[in-house]
Amino acid sequence: MGSFLFLIVVIFLFSSSVNACDRCLHRSKAAYFSSASALSSGACAYGSMATSFFAGHIAAAIPSIYKDGAGCGACFQVRCKNPKLCSTKGTIVMITDLNKSNQTDLVLSSRAFRAMAKPIVGADKDLLKQGIVDIEYQRVPCDYGNKNMNVRVEEASKKPNYLEIKLLYQGGQTEVVSIDIAQVGSSPNWGYMTRSHGAVWVTDKVPTGAIQFRFVVTGGYDGKMIWSQSVLPSNWEAGKIYDAGVQITDIAQEGCDPCDAHIWN
């Protein structure tokens, strides 16, 4: 009986160590976009804004990272493994597109690809010549300093029956699972938005007047609601960007082995 209980405890501790992880370490390969025009046509629908995020250090990711658009805006630290050409720090990239290839987990912008190189003359150009490289990568929080998350009202929006928004500068290390929407007031009647594609959310039940949002994210293993009051004024306009008044800082736990622990150094 004692041995049986000991076995249960060992299994529990092992399972906990595997499942509870802030940052999972992944090993795969990465390529880069040879055409700069591809960076502005990513599946996340950031358009030409994509190249302005993280100084153009952006990437396309496989479906398990893209998550039908929920992974748009996620940040990853990635480094290549060639000891002659690659730095140990690597670079941080933001996900802006879907990578449908089964040869690589990530396809980086050429700027991000070169940033993985050692800071020695010619290393970045030699790295580009490799085309596809072995990498390690881990998810990290997106840090925008003191900047709040923004809400962009897309051009397809039309009062009073259709609202299409895109989330920009989304911080933290988690995903927005759902968005609720309501008119600003003492007793709001909350509706919901649907993810259309990428970072774009839509609703055909548009509240009148000023609009507030509730963003549901994962903090640890649990859901958490972030309430953003009075984001869109009553005279909101398509094509404009509005300050959400809040920022996401939560970290979602991942289930994996190994965690980054002391491996990334």
UniProtKB/Swiss-Prot annotation:
Q: Where in the cell is it found?
A: Membrane
CDD domains in the cross-refs: DPBB_EXLA_N
Tell me where the signal peptide lies.
1-20
Q: Which gene encodes it?
A: EXLA1
Descriptive protein name? Expansin-like A1
Q: How does it sit in the membrane?
A: Single-pass type I membrane protein
Task: Indicate the transmembrane segments per the record.
Answer: 42-62
- Chief location of this protein? membrane
**Naturally occurring in which organism (per UniProt):** Arabidopsis thaliana (Mouse-ear cress)
GO BP annotations listed: anatomical structure morphogenesis; plant-type cell wall loosening
Which GO cellular component does the record give, naming just one?
membrane
Q: Residue ranges of the Expansin-like CBD domain? A: 161-244
Record Pfam families: DPBB_1 (PF03330), Expansin_C (PF01357)
Q: Where does the UniProt entry place glycosylation sites?
A: N99, N102
